[in-house]
């Protein structure tokens, strides 16, 4: 069954709220607007109308005017041009390998399909103990709770605001902690996700941090973000250098962990090439989706639920165009198929090939993905050129490989224009780079 979302109802909701309450006009005048859950409820369930975990999730009105929204009580929200989101730092680190205890049979690496399971596995396998470097680590608080009362400043449109009159006051707002682990030296507050994303809502770390910083007296509180994707655990620890400044967070450290063998050699790929058979170009748009990690991630999300495109747009950090590009890229590779559900909505499901990936070990899955990519001639020719010259071919060379492969626009049956092929060449280069990095990891 396809999981359906209402086609950007969130956009309609906020257009109506703005029309009724002159939200943007008020913000332009005094810098903020306070709105209640009761006022929002006239047009949409408040919980759904204010949930923007990533910058791209915000409604059109917010995107156009640079707005963000934060809860300040159990039933009130603060809308302004606060810089509410933080971009994940682009850092690559060596993978640390650990092994779960042999006696654990109820959870294994092939069954991690939720944030809670990822957290449990990170705990029992020793990932958290290694990352936090604390003794006698034990799970403590989790779930929804009320915040303490506190005030903070935040950057607005790139400017640091410290004027006392500009402080935002929070009192008894609902917060949610995915998990907390307390050791001898500190308390770690965890925020966990299964979708790869460029940014996150600082509030998810800041509000729990402020609340538990007040409760813990002298014991340090450590905000930690955990992302689990494609068998890799990504951990980011942050600190707030100024307790009262929302945007003062700084990355303390970042590590990657895996519980499986991830070593893939050139010889492994050569074995693939010896038996490789080329696929015909499918009647689907040639990929324009540069992050192959996100192609994998969107397949992971579909493995949990068949979904409609707008659900991916709203539930995860994909905007509307990104959803189309990444779903089409997965369809191009034969990992995803599109059909109509009973209500006439486009529904996306994994193919048998797509489903089979997630019963494989990490190494088997990566090799199968490499084989799938290289079975399309433009990618194979680009990979071979890289292998022979030890450098990525130029964009012009990759365009020539796309033409050699006979790639055409499925809508017209004609070759893509040079400008379009140059954009597609970026994706070819990025995916081949992913293969090279996978081998070198």
Predicted regions and their residues:
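Nuclease-adjacent, charged terminal/linker segments that flank catalytic cores
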Residues: 1-108, 112
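N-terminal, charge-rich interaction modules
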Residues: 82, 88-149
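Glycine-rich, often proline-containing surface loops adjacent to acidic residues and nearby aromatics
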Residues: 98-99, 176-192
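Phosphate/oxyanion-binding active-site loops and adjacent basic polyanion-contact surfaces
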Residues: 111-118, 168-175, 200-204
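Active-site metal-binding core of divalent-cation-utilizing nuclease and nuclease-like domains
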Residues: 137-182
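Nucleic-acid nuclease catalytic cores
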Residues: 186-188, 193-200, 212-243
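Short, hydrophobic/π-rich interface segment
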Residues: 192-216, 392-409
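Donor-sugar nucleotide-binding helix/loop cap in glycosyltransferases
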Residues: 247-441
């Amino acid at each position: 069954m396809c999981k359906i979302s209402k086609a950007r109802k969130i956009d309609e909701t906020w257009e109506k709220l703005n029309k009724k309450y002159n939200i943007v006009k008020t913000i332009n005048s005094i810098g903020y607007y306070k709105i209640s859950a009761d006022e929002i409820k006239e047009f949409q369930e408040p919980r759904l109308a204010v949930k923007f975990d990533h910058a791209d999730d915000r409604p059109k009105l917010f995107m156009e005017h640079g707005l963000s929204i934060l809860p300040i009580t159990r039933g009130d929200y603060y809308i302004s041009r606060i810089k509410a989101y933080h971009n994940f730092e682009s850092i690559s680190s060596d993978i640390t390998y650990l092994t779960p205890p042999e006696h654990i049979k109820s959870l294994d690496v092939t069954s991690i399909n939720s944030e809670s399971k990822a957290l449990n596995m990170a705990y029992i396998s020793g990932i958290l103990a290694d990352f936090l470097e604390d003794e006698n680590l034990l799970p403590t608080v989790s779930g929804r709770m009320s915040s303490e009362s506190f005030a903070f400043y935040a950057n607005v449109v790139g400017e640091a605001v410290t004027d006392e009159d500009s402080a935002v006051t929070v009192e008894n707002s609902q917060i949610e902690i995915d998990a907390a682990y307390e050791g001898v030296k500190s308390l770690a507050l965890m925020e966990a996700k299964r979708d790869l994303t460029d940014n996150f809502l600082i509030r998810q770390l800041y509000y729990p941090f402020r609340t538990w910083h007040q409760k813990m007296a002298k014991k340090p509180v450590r905000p930690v973000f955990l992302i689990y994707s494609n068998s890799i655990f990504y951990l980011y620890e942050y600190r707030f250098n100024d307790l009262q400044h929302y945007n003062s967070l700084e990355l303390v450290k970042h590590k990657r962990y895996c519980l499986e063998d991830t070593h893939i050699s050139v010889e492994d790929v050569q074995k693939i090439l010896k038996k490789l058979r080329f696929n015909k170009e499918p009647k689907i748009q040639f990929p324009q989706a540069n992050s192959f990690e996100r192609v994998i991630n969107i397949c992971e999300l579909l493995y949990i639920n068949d979904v409609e495109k707008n659900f991916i747009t709203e539930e995860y950090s994909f905007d509307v165009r990104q959803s189309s590009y990444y779903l089409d890229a997965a369809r191009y590779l034969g990992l995803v198929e599109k059909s109509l559900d009973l209500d006439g909505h486009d529904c996306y499901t994994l193919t048998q090939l797509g489903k089979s990936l997630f019963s494989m070990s990490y190494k088997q899955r990566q090799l199968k993905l490499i084989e799938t990519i290289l079975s399309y001639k433009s990618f194979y020719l680009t990979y071979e050129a890289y292998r022979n010259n030890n450098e990525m071919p130029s964009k012009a060379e990759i365009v020539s490989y796309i033409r050699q492969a006979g790639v055409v626009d499925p809508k017209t049956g004609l070759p893509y224009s040079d400008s379009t092929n140059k954009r597609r060449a970026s994706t070819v280069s990025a995916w081949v780079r992913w293969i090279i990095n996978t081998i070198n990891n």
